[in-house]
């Protein structure tokens, strides 16, 4: 039997400030809380994911950091510096604030799922249109197409900007897989290196966690209906359930 490989999820957009790090860190925290062995890869020179993980309490489920933004020393190869522990099951990749076409050659390598956060503003919608077109036409993506999902991020429901964003997303041939609110909750959790799933006692966290469960379910379904091969589940010590089922427990 072939050895299971880690599921690699890329969080990417060509524009900065759309919440890539918030999505990446919360997704890593969610999988860790559900019992997966998780690695968080930080490609951003600002090192926001790295800083988030440095604030994470030892009492919370651990997450392995790969500081891909750091320059390696004279006697250390990049591959060695970014090596993964053998037991890792989920790899979440946080990308730089601006991603050029040439960057996608490296970032798309070995990726299984792509998530594109998008903000509800005219500027972000136009930039998002260009990036998604660029992504789907990129040689690396065409050579190895994988599921792509859009995340409507920092949304205030029933506002004009929200309505415009949803109309735009309805016109795309790419699914909108989650809608996250513009909430101070994310800022507060980030200061402690935590995610939405780490604060089960908070009512606001519980409501937002429902949308995260929707995202996890989409990822599960995308992998189940894809041709990726063996899909790694939670650690054997835990009952076998999908991520979305675990999230609703």
Kindly give the residue locations of the regions a language model identified.
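Alpha-helix termini
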Residues: 57-60, 136-143, 223-229
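P-loop/Walker-type NTP enzyme "switch/lid" segment
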Residues: 3-18, 25-102, 109, 191-194, ...
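Conserved catalytic-core segment of NTP-binding enzymes
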Residues: 9, 34, 39, 96-182
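Residue-level recognition of oxygen-bearing side chains
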Residues: 23, 130, 185
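C-terminal lobe/tail of nucleotide-utilizing enzymes
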Residues: 1-6, 148-249
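Pocket-edge positions in alpha/beta enzyme catalytic cores
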Residues: 69, 120-123, 200, 204-207
């Amino acid at each position: 039997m072939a050895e299971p490989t880690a599921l690699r999820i890329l969080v990417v957009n060509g524009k900065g400030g759309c919440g890539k790090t918030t999505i990446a860190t919360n997704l890593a925290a969610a999988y860790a809380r559900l019992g997966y062995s998780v690695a968080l890869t930080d490609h951003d020179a600002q090192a926001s994911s790295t800083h988030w993980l440095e604030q994470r309490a030892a009492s919370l489920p651990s997450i392995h950091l790969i500081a891909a933004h750091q320059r390696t020393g004279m006697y250390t190869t990049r591959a060695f510096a970014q090596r993964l522990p053998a037991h890792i099951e989920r790899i979440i990749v946080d990308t730089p604030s601006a991603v050029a076409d040439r960057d996608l050659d490296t970032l798309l390598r070995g990726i299984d799922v792509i998530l594109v956060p998008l903000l509800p503003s005219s500027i972000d919608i136009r930039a998002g249109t260009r990036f998604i077109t660029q992504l789907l036409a990129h040689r690396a993506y065409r050579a190895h197409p994988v599921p792509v999902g859009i995340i409507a991020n920092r949304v205030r429901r029933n506002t004009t900007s929200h309505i415009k964003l949803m109309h735009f997303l309805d016109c795309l041939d790419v699914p909108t897989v989650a809608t996250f609110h513009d909430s101070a909750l994310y800022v507060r959790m980030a200061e402690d290196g935590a995610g939405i799933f780490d604060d089960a006692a908070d009512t606001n966290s519980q409501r937002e966690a429902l949308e995260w469960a929707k995202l996890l379910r989409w990822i599960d379904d995308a992998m189940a209906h894809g041709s990726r091969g063996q899909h790694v589940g939670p650690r054997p010590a835990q009952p076998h359930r999908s991520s979305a089922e675990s999230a609703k427990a």
